[in-house]
A protein has these predicted regions:
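Short, well-ordered alpha-helical
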Residues: 1-72, 94-97, 241, 346, ...
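A short helix-breaking turn/cap at a secondary-structure junction
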Residues: 21-33, 159-242, 262, 406-434
């Protein structure tokens, strides 16, 4: 039992409208956590399918309400880290929806325009973060409930790798793919909360000990973009995504088209196969006795799980596994997947008029993520001409949570947006604690120079140009005959016989250096070059024997001058 509450919760459904609909239980005085800790001074809210000891857990269904005997594992960890709990927030009933209107406690509005949906199912959590009522909030995410509301409200939604945060004490939606998610106005706060919340829990059968990738994406990275995208007629959203691609390119990303079909087919399995039986199984004991007290369309979704048998479930799981294998090679071509968080916005009255199809549309780019065991981060991207937010989602393999956060923080700050709906500017970017990749400096002198035929071998390995400079005056440069593409040979000679040769110095991740060196054909190789400033770097060298019969081009000062000298002069 929890002490310190001075406000009791009324679990009788009293439909609210406007901002009041965001809360189901709001404490008069926040429940204080530890007096010190990583989260000291931060106030949070919990989605009301997450237990807080001594308070009712309703899952937005009054007939289901029960007083929680103890805190959910994640709530306890956050309190122990110093955060204070302000209350519990509204949701789509039993976390079954992506729009925020499926609750007897009221439809939660969008924080930018109250006539539009907030997104769900973690509707209240997103709203109270976006409007500055709390510093962060817990949601849950099975099909996008921790991402869609973030994208529609100009905030950050962190959907961790499955099992990274314990779900013990959370009312399950589909337990094998449920994740506790985090809403915040900045990536920095979301990562602070993640570090406090994560950890293996032996009492949660789906908890995992995961070693997170701690090396950020390099200055050059590849991001996937679906070859075909659907925005359901929303041209403003379509244009916003084009701009998002351009923003990610400006951060060093190279777009790569991917086949979205395996991901889309996996998403379809969530509700249109025997996998939906897991949603029914999650609340079967209650639902079989109280079906009439569950609101539509949640009732129909849960009831649909009854029509499948065990063989159907085995077939669906096999189909999902096949799609996972079909999608896996995508990660050989890209480092991260870029998607719209939601393809469009819908008005509340439109959603109520067509609750199934429009809800399905909102999940067009989220439903597959948990099924395929990926991590995801939704970050604000822009405000559309109509004033509504547009968010993007960065998706990566399991364990890429911190990598996504580092890139997401860079992207968020490049957007120039304010925090949520508060109008407050973003604070400066924070050090998220990732390790910088080990790198090596390599000087290139010929076909690997910027704009030359082999420069792509550097770029595709994440190498970054540091400077254009010269060697010390103790080298000679030769044009090697018979090389394709044409290449020079750099040979060290006594200072009295040499000259300074133009080079470019590139910085390359050490992890990719070996594969780069393996591409270098004889008589070329890698050695140590001395630069004009006296420093030494790795760089291209040539066997002296190979220069016999080669053209000495030292007097030109570099390979680029040599190539230019061979170009035909255009007639005046």
């Amino acid at each position: 039992m929890v002490h310190g509450f001075d406000a009791a919760a009324d679990t009788t459904a009293q439909e609210q409208s406007g901002p009041e609909a965001a809360w189901i239980t709001r404490l008069g005085t926040p429940l204080q956590g530890a007096s010190n800790g990583a989260l000291a001074g931060l106030v949070f809210a919990a989605k009301d399918n997450i237990d807080v000891g001594g308070l009712p857990t309703t899952a937005a269904c009054p007939a289901f309400a029960r007083t929680a005997p103890a805190h959910a594992h994640v709530v306890q960890r956050l309190l122990d880290a110093g955060a204070a709990l302000a209350g519990k927030t509204n949701l789509d009933q039993f976390a079954c929806g992506l729009n925020g209107t499926r609750s007897p406690y009221g439809a939660v509005p969008n924080s930018f325009d109250a006539s539009f949906v907030s997104g769900g199912s973690s509707s209240g959590s997103a709203y109270v973060v976006a409007t500055g009522q709390v510093d962060f909030a817990l949601g849950t995410d099975t099909a996008g409930s921790g991402r869609v509301p973030a994208g529609l409200n100009n905030i950050v939604g962190l959907k961790p790798s499955k099992g990274l945060i314990s779900a013990r004490g959370v009312v399950p939606a589909a337990q094998s793919v449920d994740c506790v998610s985090i809403f915040a106005r900045t990536v920095q706060v979301a990562v602070q909360v993640l570090r406090a919340a994560m950890g293996f829990d032996a009492q949660d059968p789906f908890s995992r000990s995961l070693a997170l990738e701690r090396e950020p994406f390099g200055p050059r990275f590849r991001f996937g973009v679906p070859s075909e995208l659907q925005f359901f007629g929303d041209e403003q959203a379509a244009q916003a995504f084009v701009q998002a691609i351009e923003k990610l390119q400006a951060l060093g990303g190279a777009p790569v088209q991917i086949d979205y079909e395996p991901l889309a087919q996996a998403a379809e399995l969530l509700y249109d196969s025997a996998l939906v039986a897991e949603r029914y199984a999650a609340v079967r004991g209650f639902f079989d006795e109280h079906e009439a007290e569950v609101m539509e369309p949640v009732r129909s979704i849960l009831a649909s799980g009854r029509r499948y048998d065990a063989a159907d479930l085995v077939d669906a799981q096999a189909r999902l596994r096949a799609l996972a294998q079909q999608a896996a090679p995508m990660w050989e071509d890209i480092d991260v997947l870029l998607l719209p968080t939601a393809p469009t916005h819908y008005r509340i009255d439109a959603m109520r008029a067509d609750p199934v199809q429009l809800n399905k549309n909102l999940g067009a780019y989220t439903n597959f993520v948990n099924l395929l065991d990926y991590a995801a981060l939704s970050v604000p991207s822009s405000l559309r001409p109509d004033g509504l937010p547009f968010g993007i989602t960065l998706v990566g393999p399991c364990g890429s949570d911190l990598q996504l956060a580092e890139l997401g923080q860079r992207y968020h700050h490049a957007s120039g947006l304010a925090q949520g709906a508060t109008g407050e500017p973003l604070p400066p970017p924070a050090d998220l604690g990732l390790s910088r990749p080990a790198t090596v400096k390599v000087a290139v002198v010929g076909a690997h120079l910027s704009g030359m035929p082999l420069n792509g071998q550097l770029v595709e390995r994440g190498a970054q140009l540091l400077e254009k400079t010269h060697t010390a005056s103790q080298y000679r440069l030769y044009a090697l005959p018979g090389t394709v593409p044409p290449k020079p040979g750099l040979v060290r000679v006594p200072p009295s016989e040499g000259a300074a040769i133009a080079v470019e110095v590139w910085q390359m991740p050490l992890a990719h250096y070996g594969s780069f060196v393996a591409l270098i054909p004889a008589p070329l190789g890698i050695g140590t070059l001395q630069l004009a400033d006296g420093s030494s770097v790795q760089g291209f060298v040539c066997e002296a024997l190979a220069t016999e019969g080669a053209t000495d081009i030292t007097h030109l000062g570099g390979w680029r001058r040599y190539i230019e000298s061979r170009q035909p002069i255009a007639a005046a």
